Amino acid sequence: MAFEEAIKRVFMKKICMKCNSRNSWKATKCRKCGYTNLRPKAKEARA
């Protein structure tokens, strides 16, 4: 894929389930609220 670096930069994030902030891929807790339930950023578009 031609834009693999760009895709990694955009999608290699984790989203806090409590406050929806973006966190680094290696994060174990949210940088804003400290919540530990993080999900990977969705790679597929919603319907």
Swiss-Prot record:
Keywords: Ribonucleoprotein, Ribosomal protein. The keyword Ribosomal protein applies. Pfam families: Ribosomal_L40e (PF01020). SUPFAM superfamilies: Zn-binding ribosomal proteins. The keyword Ribosomal protein applies. GO terms for molecular function: structural constituent of ribosome. Transmembrane segments: none annotated. One of its GO terms (cellular component) is ribonucleoprotein complex. GO terms for biological process: translation. It comes from the Archaea. Belongs to the eukaryotic ribosomal protein eL40 family. This is Large ribosomal subunit protein eL40. It comes from Methanococcus maripaludis (strain DSM 14266 / JCM 13030 / NBRC 101832 / S2 / LL). The gene is rpl40e.
